[in-house]
């Protein structure tokens, strides 16, 4: 199947390799550019660290990792935990599939920690709102949406050459739908099967045929894709 990937450019290569190994034809359509933001570690005695996106580590120096090496890490997703282990093999990591699951785990410890939250400039504020006053946000990156879909993407959709689109977040799904409308492609999206990594990611896709992964992981996203293959 020809599968459109809407991930950030820094994430897309690994996903394309996995799709190719499964016998699909991956087509890259990165919707975001990940850029650094100026930051420094606040002068405060933090006792735990929160990460909800692996991109929070994209511009972290080795020196920064050394300064936070003794903190327990609360994180979302295997990519985040893999990065932590790569830099700090003996780190104490508490990992969850989603931010809401992570928040449930954090709330058990909230009164005994002062949290440093490594995050992006654009983010949902649920964690910050619910953990006040025990949390300080440190913005380490920005994810800037592109202005238009690529010419290749537009032409492939118009010619019905795309059979499936993978959506990795609510924001990426919203961005794709908006850019597709801008390119005059809205009616064409009904001929494509969409797969969302979560119910939240599926929200902007209600007008189109959409399946949702059973868990918010790329592996489960690919499981849905495999189930759609012609027998």
Give short role names for the model-derived ranges.
Residues 1-231:
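Signature of uroporphyrinogen-III synthase
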